[in-house]
Amino acid sequence: VFRDQSIPTAQILALQQVLQSFQNSLPQDTPWSISATSAFREAKNRDEAHHELARQGFQIQILTGLEEADLIHHLFRRQWPELSGTTLHADLGGGSLELSLEKDAQLLWQDSLPLGVLRAGKRPDLSSLEALTEPFAKVSLSHRQLVVSGGSAREWGERLVSEGIFGAHEPGRSIFEYQFLPLRKAKTRSATIFSRLIEMWKPEQVVIPRIGLKEGLLLNLAEQLSNEECRLSLGKEVPVLQVNLPQAEVGS
């Protein structure tokens, strides 16, 4: 889609079949919604695809990049209200990178960059990310955190651990702390993007949770149905990878 800027007819048909199968598997009267992100919103034939799916009874909400960023930021505020300091939240998807910057729980700005692991291919164009060097420099360096989410972030974190780039963790803990080692060694498509983001943002910690846009959409649906603030029940232990970064080594 990112190369041709079009959703092939075969993929539209396949999506219909997947949605129909999913709908059939749900108990009757189960509330559900369908949301589409960067690939759908950038496709030149999105109106045609949207109409065809609607004709089959499937109403799709096409999210903007800023709507994605807001959903994810809202999720983390609900789930981890104790997060403090200056936090940059980066959610990397297939076609876009959603960013939210907050200080002491106050949102400062949000942005959506045309940078994703499927769009990037083997050599990602980091120019949209490099443009943030000056805005980053204006933010206080003290108590900086970077929260990276999405499937690419989880894959990156798991590869860092499995390849021994991080040492063994302490069993039974929901937050694992690791000392910083070269992050580019993880052979994932997202490693270059995340490594450059760390070099630019210079955080004291990187947090890699296992929740992201999907959970943000679920939380949003729950709050719409209940008409009140909600919080997802994620179990007693939410898997989180927390990486401590000695500042002298961030740029290495």
Kindly give the residue locations of the regions a language model identified.
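Helical "lid/coupling" subdomains associated with nucleotide-phosphate turnover
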Residues: 2-23, 40-50, 54-86, 101-252
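Glycine-rich beta-to-alpha transition loops that act as phosphate-gripper elements at the mouths
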Residues: 39-40, 92
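A short acidic Gly-Thr/Ser loop motif
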Residues: 90-96, 149-152
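Signal peptide-proximal N-terminal region
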Residues: 24-28
